[in-house]
């Protein structure tokens, strides 16, 4: 059963014996993602979120992924309970393997995504600190995960479908001169695997609560892999917000706090960060808020320069600051 409408969601809830037909239920579509249908359910004082995977993602290019990934997601969330505080990750309440659906707890009323806060000019360093702290815990404490689950999470099929293929391999088609460099980055992600990786560690997947703490969502790309991906992915989004908003000092402060609070060390971060920037310009899922062609070209130049970087491990914060200063003068 595909949950495309409010009425379909209500029928589904009744069929699954999750609500009684005579009881009023409020159903609201939650936007923001391209890979799933997500709905908020409110019944009396109870609030849940229902999520169903899409086979074809909602982007312009043809982009497909196995809907079984939704079950990887809720199993990862169950394991995360042993790593981070309960308040930082939703709890899984119901799983439906037939329709590729699961239901989880809903965040408190009034929360906003970190992305929305940034886009509205709210630059709170405590949010960056909270995000980095959660990521650090996931990376450093994931050795606690059940061994059988580690084996399952080592399968990178969904990661390939949702990240490597639409980002790295798609870029190779557009930039064949970067084939060797991008292939090296793919190899690092597939071979240097040391911990649980979120795979979609973006400000849009962080719900900021009233107390400033973050609720982390969207684990469908999670896998046992290289932690550099999560850092590059998040930093790329923060850099793009800086260029779009022209708030370089504010975003640099957030990036500095994020890197300082992470407290871990990853190798070869700058080339992976460059790849993320280029993917958000020319991959299968480019950001929709950067439209200025001259700015896009400047970002491409930064990205390619970093992807092809062969120098000793550079200071990432200094490299970001230099590019902010350079582009801010254009």
Regions found by a protein language model. Give the residues of each.
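ATP-binding pocket architecture of kinase catalytic cores
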Residues: 30, 39-146
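Active-site catalytic-loop/activation-segment of kinase and kinase-like phosphoryl-transfer enzymes
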Residues: 1-11, 102-105, 137-188
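ATP/Mg2+ or Mg2+-diphosphate-binding catalytic cores
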Residues: 249, 280-330
């Amino acid at each position: 059963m595909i949950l495309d409408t409010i009425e379909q969601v209500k029928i589904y809830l009744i069929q699954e014996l999750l609500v009684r037909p005579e009881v009023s239920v409020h159903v609201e579509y939650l936007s923001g993602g391209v890979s799933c249908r997500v709905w908020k359910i409110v019944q009396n004082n109870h609030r849940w979120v229902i999520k169903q995977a899409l086979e074809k993602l909602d982007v312009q290019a043809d982009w497909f992924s196995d809907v079984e990934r939704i079950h990887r997601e809720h199993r990862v969330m169950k394991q995360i309970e042993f790593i981070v505080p309960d308040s930082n990750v939703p709890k899984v309440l119901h799983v439906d393997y037939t329709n590729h659906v699961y239901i989880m707890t809903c965040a408190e009323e009034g929360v906003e995504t970190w992305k929305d806060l940034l886009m509205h000019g709210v630059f709170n360093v405590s949010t960056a600190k909270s995000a980095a702290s959660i990521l650090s815990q996931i990376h450093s404490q994931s050795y606690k995960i059940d061994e059988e689950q580690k084996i399952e999470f080592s399968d990178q099929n969904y990661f390939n479908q949702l990240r490597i293929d639409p980002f790295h391999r798609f870029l190779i088609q557009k930039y064949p001169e970067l084939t060797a460099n991008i292939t090296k980055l793919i190899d690092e992600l597939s071979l240097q695997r040391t911990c649980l990786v979120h795979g979609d560690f973006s400000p849009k997947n962080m719900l900021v609560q009233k107390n400033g703490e973050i609720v982390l969502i969207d684990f469908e790309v999670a896998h046992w892999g290289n932690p550099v991906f999560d850092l590059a992915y998040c930093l790329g989004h923060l850099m793009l917000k800086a260029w779009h908003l022209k708030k370089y000092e504010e975003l640099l402060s957030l990036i500095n706090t994020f890197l300082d609070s992470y407290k871990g060390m990853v190798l070869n971060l700058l080339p992976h960060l460059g790849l993320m920037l280029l993917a958000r310009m020319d991959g299968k899922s480019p950001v929709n808020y950067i439209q200025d062609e001259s700015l896009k070209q400047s970002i491409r130049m930064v990205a390619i320069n970093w992807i092809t970087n062969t120098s000793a491990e550079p200071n990432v914060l200094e490299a970001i600051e230099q590019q902010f200063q350079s582009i801010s003068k254009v």
